[in-house]
Amino acid sequence: MKKLELVLSIILFTLVLGVFLYTITPTLPFWDCGEFISCSYSLGVPHPPGTPLMILLGNMFVKIFFFIKEVALRVNLFSAFTSALSAVMLFLISMKVFRRVNPSPDRQEEIVNYATAFLTSFLASFLYSFWQSAVEAEVYNPA
């Protein structure tokens, strides 16, 4: 069933990232996002305590997506990408927990486990606070 887990992970990532890309903030959003965008572009230090990993990875996205004109959109893409990865991680962790609770499920239980983990991860991706952080340059979801 590892192959099914991989297929479901790819489907989940694609669906979640697709929705995030459809609703992504194309320019500079409000609050701290502008600071994170400018620091990702210039490798600056945002307000204390700083977020060095987010800034370095955001800078990597700025450089990879050089063909996109808006720097803000490039950093917002980083947040959407890492948020979609978070959904996949939640799915994989849920499956690991299900396997620990019931190491030898029958076929029907296994289908229920996969469906539950997939739907939980999918729906959790669209909770208000998670979705809001996923479509703008914010540090919460990449962390």
Question: What feature does the model see in each segment?
Answer:
Residues M1-L12, A72-F78, N113:
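Membrane-interface helix-boundary signature
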Residues Y41, M89-M95, F126, F130, ...:
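Specific aromatic-rich, kink-prone transmembrane helix
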Residues K2-F30, A124-S125:
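Transmembrane signal-anchor helices characteristic of membrane glycosylation enzymes that use polyprenol
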Residues L8, L12, I37-C39, V71, ...:
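Hydrophobic transmembrane alpha-helices of multi-pass secondary transporters
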Residues I10, L77-D106, S125:
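Transmembrane-helix motifs of polytopic, lipid-linked glycan transferases
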Residues T23, I68-N76, S104-N113, T120-N141:
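Aromatic- and kink-enriched transmembrane "portal" helix at the membrane-lumen/periplasm boundary
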Residues V19, I24-T25, G58, V62, ...:
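Membrane-water interface at transmembrane helix exits
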Residues I24-F36, P46-M60, L73:
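Extracytoplasmic catalytic/substrate-binding loops of multi-pass membrane glycan-assembly enzymes
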